[in-house]
Design a protein with these regions (language model features):
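Short beta-to-alpha transition helix within the HATPase_c
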Residues: 1-22, 45
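Conserved sequence/structural motifs within the catalytic ATP-binding
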Residues: 2-6, 33, 67-69
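Short conserved segments within the C-terminal catalytic ATPase subdomain
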Residues: 16-26, 60, 103
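Conserved short strand/loop->alpha-helix "switch" segment adjacent to the catalytic nucleotide/phosphoryl-transfer site
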Residues: 21-49, 53
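ATP phosphate-binding glycine-rich loop and adjacent ATP-lid/helix-beta elements
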Residues: 46, 50, 54, 84-119
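Short beta-strand/loop element within the Bergerat-fold HATPase_c
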Residues: 60-79, 108
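Glycine-rich/acidic phosphate-handling loop/turn and adjacent ATP-lid/helix
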Residues: 70-95, 127
Length: 128
């Protein structure tokens, strides 16, 4: 069963670990995230993991970043022979989610490593 905190960044990572992903959690919430922002972060993690699972479920994955008073950054770094394949995917659903929250998404690939970074400003309320 999924953890009770399934819709949080930490819960998403815990669930992935329990599901067999080789994932390390280096995310730090210096400021507690609102339930809505935490759920958005969790959704981004689940979306990225769905891409990873299709290609290389055993890829070494690290989630880092932080939540502060003003923003939340998430960086999901994957070391895999499939890094170039990940880099060719537009990740449009993740970009759309980030941009719908006033944020941005970038990806970077080099030498067997692929990184997706999301920056979300804090303080906005969830859409009605």
């Amino acid at each position: 069963a999924p953890p009770g905190n399934f819709a949080t960044i930490d819960g998403a990572i815990t669930h992935a670990q329990q599901s067999g992903f080789a994932i390390v959690n280096l995310f730090t919430a210096y400021t507690p995230l609102s339930r809505f922002r935490d759920a958005v972060g969790a959704e981004i993690i689940y979306l990225v993991l769905s891409h990873i699972a299709e290609l290389d479920k055993f890829a070494s994955t690290t989630v880092s970043g932080a939540a502060t008073d003003t923003d939340c950054t998430l960086a999901i770094r994957v070391i895999s022979t499939e890094a170039d394949t990940l880099a060719q995917r537009p990740m449009g659903e993740i970009r759309a989610l980030a941009e719908s929250q006033g944020g941005t998404m970038d990806t970077n690939a080099q030498a067997g490593t692929w990184t997706l970074s999301v920056h979300l400003p804090l303080g906005e309320s969830p859409p009605a």
